[in-house]
């Protein structure tokens, strides 16, 4: 959901500048002659590289998921790391006098696909949302027994075993749902899949003499800022020996602003994320933070005793926390519903035009206009076909296993709900993948939310919350992975990589991710206070998703006083903001805030929005000084900042589990208390 928002806004400037030069970045004749067989595109060194990159990025995105829930698109960064890893590998072996296979762009594509498939499970596996929403802590934060529809039986504590099994059951079904339609989507409909195309352009560019020189500069920038970020995170650790200690509690704008979450916390992860995200995303985050923590929450807090009982704690769902959660839900639902209808409408019109063109013979004339290189790509893409029976048998087998196993794991979700879900999955997956091909927007979270409300309402009060949350994960996983696979097929089509090797690498990455993601989650869950709304790892979307399920069970009776009217207003604002954005000229519309981005700081606070705006400011200043160099180096520098800070999580987690505490607590207080 959060990465979807950044995908639709973030047409990377590198993509804009080089997309038209795709033909120029490669010697087509040599490329077509030197394509290795599909089995040789998958190598042992490639799987090792994918595993290492997948683990690193799983740790990074898990931290982002459990702190704010906002995850930028890291595919370009993963492609760069894959290139760095394998180019270094081959050079070291060559210097040692060991003969090794040449590093091809097909192998680069396979490694990038496998690594992204691995860490995508950590992003979208529900560890910060629908699965974590089942635990006891989130149940208590949602009001416990004081909230109608929120029953203590509707909980399930996280466990490596059941989480791993659930991921295997749901993810592999989605992997096979749309395989038979790959030719229709990529060749017949010629869907662009902008993220897949951008990744292909980057990889093609790496494997040219000019691109190799550019890559060396990017590698140097990545290593430099990775080292700085890691050392800075290590340095900060020494001063964080308490709950409110360290640089993350630095009162940048004063102590009163600190209380309202307005401060710069020196997080290189979010500075790097801000460099990757478009300026409008970061501005929207800051606008949401000012509106909520700067204006609304202080005003509503002042109405204690009038709008809600003064005896209630602030974190009660019938107190201030209820307004925070449900108003952010209304923004998310308003934005999601608008985008959902818009994409369905756009998909329908586009398909109607395509069918009309085919019937009138226009598609043949378009085919005649294709270049020889395009026709050759199409031929290679079709040549290594994936047998229909493999997809059909695999889909049926995984579906049967899921229909049997998931109701055993979650008795609240009846088997017939799963049967209906798997019957609808291919059509839902096709709709989402087609829309993603046109707009680069993965609407899987919105399909999941629709399933959440329907199942929560149908399953009844006792079972509704669990059925809604698990059903949401089921639909979301199938629909999302189907769309991701089509993005990868587009990348493979443009880099002359076999669809078979792409499917196998996606399957390997998914299998690795289904094991790595739960282990990564438990690293955080055991080492840190995950779910504490006053701490760093708030996991805000776990609370959001559980309350959406309660809303599906109980309706509007779950809301605190006057909250419904505010929710109506913010829902309408989300729809209106999107309408204005789409209808006005780009010069004006592009500056309308994004409701989905605004919703995140409503729960989390304003500190990370300030971090990300610092990242935006760096990119803006860099572009003003040297636009070409900025376009080349920003992704590498941002990736270095994110990876260095993210990798420090591993040693810090080990230290926390071993009971080793930082030696110093650096805190701040008013000068009147200094005596």
Curated annotation (Swiss-Prot):
The gene is YSL3. It is found in: Membrane. Induction: Slight induction by manganese, copper or zinc deficiency. Inhibited upon iron deficiency and induced by iron overload. May be involved in the lateral transport of nicotianamine-chelated metals in the vasculature. Belongs to the YSL (TC 2.A.67.2) family. This is Metal-nicotianamine transporter YSL3. GO terms for biological process: developmental process involved in reproduction; iron ion transport; response to nematode; seed development. Disruption phenotype: No visible phenotype. The keyword Acetylation does not apply.
């Amino acid at each position: 959901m959060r990465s979807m928002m950044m995908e639709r806004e973030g047409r990377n400037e590198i993509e804009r500048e080089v997309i038209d030069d795709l033909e120029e970045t490669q010697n087509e004749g040599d490329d077509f002659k030197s394509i290795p067989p599909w089995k040789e595109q998958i190598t042992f060194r490639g799987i090792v590289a994918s595993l290492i990159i997948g683990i690193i990025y799983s740790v990074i995105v898990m931290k982002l998921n459990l702190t704010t829930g906002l995850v930028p698109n890291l595919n370009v960064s993963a492609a760069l790391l894959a290139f760095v890893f394998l180019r270094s590998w081959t050079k070291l072996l060559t210097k040692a006098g060991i003969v090794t296979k040449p590093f091809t762009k097909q192998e680069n594509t396979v490694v990038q696909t496998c690594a992204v498939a691995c860490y995508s499970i950590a992003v979208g596996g529900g560890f910060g949302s629908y699965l974590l929403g089942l635990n006891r802590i989130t149940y208590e934060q949602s009001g416990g027994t004081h909230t109608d529809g929120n029953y203590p039986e509707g909980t399930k504590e996280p466990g490596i075993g059941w989480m791993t099994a659930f991921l295997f059951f749901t993810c592999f079904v989605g992997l096979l749902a749309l395989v038979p339609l790959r030719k229709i989507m990529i060749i017949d409909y010629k869907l662009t899949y902008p993220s897949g195309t951008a990744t292909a352009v980057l990889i093609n560019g790496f494997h040219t003499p000019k691109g190799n020189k550019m890559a060396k500069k990017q590698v140097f920038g990545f290593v430099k800022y990775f080292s700085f970020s890691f050392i800075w995170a290590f340095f900060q650790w020494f001063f964080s020996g308490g709950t409110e200690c360290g640089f993350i509690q630095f009162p940048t704008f004063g102590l009163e602003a600190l209380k309202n979450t307005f401060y710069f916390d020196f997080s290189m992860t979010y500075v790097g994320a801000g460099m990757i995200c478009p300026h409008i995303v970061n501005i929207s985050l800051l606008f949401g933070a000012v509106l909520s923590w700067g204006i609304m929450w202080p005003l509503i807090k002042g109405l204690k005793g009038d709008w809600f009982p003064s005896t209630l704690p602030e974190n009660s769902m019938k107190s201030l926390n209820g307004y925070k959660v449900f108003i952010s839900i209304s923004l998310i639902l308003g934005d999601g519903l608008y985008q959902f209808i818009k994409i369905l409408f756009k998909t329908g019109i586009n398909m109607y035009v395509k069918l009309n063109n085919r019937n009138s013979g226009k598609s043949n004339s378009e085919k005649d206009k294709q270049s020889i290189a395009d026709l050759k790509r199409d031929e290679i893409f079709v040549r290594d076909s994936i047998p229909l029976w493999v997809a059909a048998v695999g889909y049926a087998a995984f579906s049967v296993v899921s229909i049997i196993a998931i109701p055993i794991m979650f008795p609240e979700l009846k088997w017939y709900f799963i049967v209906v879900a798997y019957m609808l999955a291919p059509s839902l997956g096709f709709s989402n993948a087609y829309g993603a091909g046109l707009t680069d927007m993965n609407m899987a979270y919105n399909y999941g939310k629709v399933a959440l409300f329907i199942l929560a309402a149908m399953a009844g009060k006792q079972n509704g919350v669990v059925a809604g949350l698990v059903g949401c994960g089921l639909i979301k996983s199938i629909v999302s992975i189907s769309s991701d696979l089509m993005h990868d097929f587009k990348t493979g089509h443009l880099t002359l990589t076999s669809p078979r090797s792409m499917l196998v690498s996606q399957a390997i990455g998914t299998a690795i991710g289904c094991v790595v993601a739960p282990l990564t989650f438990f690293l955080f869950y055991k080492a840190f206070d995950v779910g504490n709304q006053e701490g760093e790892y708030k996991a805000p979307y776990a609370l959001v998703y559980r309350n959406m399920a309660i809303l599906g069970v109980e309706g509007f009776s779950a809301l605190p006083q006057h909250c419904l009217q505010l929710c109506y207003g913010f829902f309408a604002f989300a729809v209106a903001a999107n309408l204005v954005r789409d209808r006005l000229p780009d010069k004006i519309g592009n500056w309308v805030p994004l409701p989905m981005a605004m919703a995140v700081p409503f729960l989390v606070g304003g500190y990370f929005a300030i971090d990300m705006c610092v990242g935006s400011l760096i990119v803006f200043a860099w572009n003003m000084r040297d636009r070409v160099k900025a376009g080349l180096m920003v992704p590498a520098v941002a990736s270095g900042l994110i990876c260095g800070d993210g990798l420090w999580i591993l040693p810090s987690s080990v230290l926390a589990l071993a009971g080793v505490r930082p030696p110093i607590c650096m805190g701040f207080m008013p000068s009147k208390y200094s005596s």
